Design a protein with these regions (language model features):
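C-terminal effector/interaction modules appended to NTPase cores
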Residues: 1-105
Length: 105
């Protein structure tokens, strides 16, 4: 699983988003590299055009996916935040770590 800390900002005019454990937008790392991530923070709502520092857990990023995106990842890189194919915001990657899958016995 990939864990990240990022600054996020939602850019759709006058559109706010509800926070909570079920908030899982899609983050675009590069062309064709889209992963949903659970945004973890104490905020119950994300307001239009405000900057928030949050943690994000990408449960669907496992060994093979991480091997594909790791070469393009760098601190300070920009990501787009999407709902389906619609871009709803931007993010800046502040920190990240990866915990790989353990081999089955």
């Amino acid at each position: 699983m990939l864990r990240a800390q990022a600054e996020i900002k939602f850019t759709l005019l006058n559109q706010n988003y509800e926070g909570g454990k079920h908030f899982r937008p899609v983050f675009r790392f590069a062309d064709g590299m889209l992963f949903s991530g659970t945004v973890i923070s104490d905020h119950t709502e994300y307001l239009y055009n405000h900057l928030y520092t949050v943690d994000i857990e990408f449960f669907t990023v496992e060994d093979e996916a991480y091997a594909a995106i790791q070469p393009v990842m760098s601190l300070g890189m920009g990501l787009t935040i999407q709902a389906g194919s619609r871009i709803i915001g931007i993010a800046t990657l502040l920190d990240y770590s990866y915990v790989g899958q353990k081999a089955a016995c």
